[in-house]
Amino acid sequence: MTELTYARKASGLVRGLDMWDAFGAGLMTCQPIATLWLMVGIALSLFPSGNLTIAIILGALTAGLGAPLVWGILSGSMPRAGGEYVYNSRILHPAIALGAQFTNIIAIFYWNWFIATWLGVPALQLFGQYMGWAGFSDWVASKGGLFILGLIIVVIGYLSVVFSMKSYAIIQKIMLIPAIGGCIVLIAAIWMTSKGDFVSHWNAIATQYHSLDYNAFIKAAGNLPTTWNWHDTLGAFSGVYALFVYNYAIAYLSGEVKRPDKTLLAGNILAVWVPVVLGLFLATGLYHMVDFNFLGASAQASFGAGVKGYTAPYSPDVLTLSWIASGKSGVVAWSILLAFIAVIWLEITIAILIIGRAWLAWGLDRMGPKWFTDVSPRHASPIKNLTVAMVIFAVGVAAYVLWLTSSLSGLIGGGMQFISVFLITGIAGVLFPYRKKVRGIWEASPYRTWKIAGIPVVTIGGVLYLIFIIAMLYFSFVDPTSRDVTGKNLFVFAAAWAAGIVWYFFWRARSAKQGIDISVTFGELPPE
């Protein structure tokens, strides 16, 4: 009887992905090179007394342990397409799940309009500056250049996933090489350079462009701290957070991986800890190469109010610091560019995939129009969903370039996801073993016997995860240092939640008019 309430008897998807495909989806959503760039720039422009190394270690001890457990166990217990919507609608309530995922989809669109512009700035702009191509750098950073490049990457991402998950998997495996390799080259350049050599390289550029030498640059940035404190170190969660949380994208492939009980947990662990290791090596390398207040001045110049008198033609962010450290090496310049191309390409691709799978899951539960459940028998792909998502991405890139551009867009989009995706799903992870309505799902879970001192491991993981999430939300949206920058965007968050809840009640009422009681579907898993 229950299966009659679902819109289809089967999802139409095919289980053909392996653990490396799952890992790749999580890692590419983290976007290692971009995460390292934003980690330093956002954290230290807002909280200049923050110690990145300590912030990463604290994050690793909480979210680094909790995130893979929560997402790996929930997805392995409920291996269906649709991500956190499936878990939260069963464990908590479908209205909460739809409000949360509605907001996540808005955040994904916003995030990826921003990410699509990265092909122009910083990737190609910095590369052109490093190569001395002033005209090229100016064009890729112009509104026209940003829009054209952003549109190209959206279309390429769409074509990479719309007709075949096999082609997506092949492309992703290839792109993992420059995505990880570029970060390793960047970090190696920093670790191989002494402070004396870096200062010499920096001062040579200052002389060439009549800019500020090393000491003058620090002085011009103002009275920046020379050591760290606990407040700003916890505040640095606003920058390092992306190392720990974007493994969640793997959940959207849950209905398409082989051996989900093992594949999903292993993929989640790798997708969190590879970025953590890269982040730790970068942070410790930077403190080895430059003074604490120089790093703060670099963040202020590239992500903050700027530094008066700095006239070199490139932003002094962590990417440029690595290139300068290498003696302006072409290998480092190409490594940065290729790493950005890889993560931008795959992140846009995965974002389109996520939205298509989310709408499919809604449709299966009769929480959306019938075409949400249309899956091509030939390609095993929800082509209509993916096409609509691609069009919204393309239109949104234009809107973003013209009106919405902000260097803190990632923090704003990430904040929306922290509440709607990570906080809500963390709560679901804590409650999963104890909710009567999903007792049958928990009893069938391969992780039901995993306990420490009698407490289910998923509950422990959820608590650790929530500790990090709550701290990050406070320092990114409540603390006086950041709230004036990010708080004004909370109205978008509230509107998205309201729209998702209204959406749920509309479709529930519509199904009731057709004589279908959809409430019975939310105590069990949707069709495979």
Go through each PLM region and give its residues:
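Membrane-interface loop-to-helix entry segments
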Residues: 17, 21, 147-212, 245, ...
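Hydrophobic, small-residue-rich membrane helices and short re-entrant helix-turn-helix hairpins
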Residues: 9-16, 83, 163-174, 244-283, ...
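A generic transmembrane alpha-helix motif of multi-pass inner-membrane proteins
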Residues: 31, 39, 55, 179-182, ...
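Hydrophobic transmembrane alpha-helices that form the core helical bundles
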Residues: 42, 55, 61, 65-154, ...
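Membrane-interface "cap" regions at the ends of multi-pass membrane proteins
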Residues: 1-54, 63-66, 205-212, 508-528
